[in-house]
């Protein structure tokens, strides 16, 4: 149990900004595998886009479902975003999700894995608000 808990907890490390002497907060994931990392990645996306999260249970039919494979380097920088399943009726959603992931970089650094690839399912409502399958509140 301790190992599982440690794998999903994230620690904060203060890093000096180059040449400025200022301090920047950088999040590090202690996940030991891609499955455990999903929660850290999802929490980071939720924190980055808090105003765009769909609150409560999603409607029975969501507007779009996007399945994404994200590859990160050891520092949490996004190396690639591969769309595994895309909504053909809503290509704008696909591009928006891709751009949101890139702009959220760096994600928590997967230091125990030296980089990772993980999958996430984005559930997008007609309003444009979303939930990630990892942290979804379910559907009505």
Task: Label the predicted regions.
Residues 1-8:
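Bacterial N-terminal signal peptides that target proteins for export
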Residues 60-67:
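Short, small/polar residue-rich loop motifs at catalytic or cofactor-binding pockets
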Residues 91-94, 99:
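Short, hydrophobic/π-rich interface segment
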Residues 23-32, 39-51, 71-85, 98-108, ...:
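Conserved "boundary/linchpin" sites in short secondary-structure elements
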Residues 56-58:
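Acidic, negatively charged sequence signal
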Residues 15-19:
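N-terminal signal peptide c-region/cleavage motif recognized by signal peptidases
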Residues 11-12:
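Repetitive helical segments and hydrophobic/amphipathic motifs
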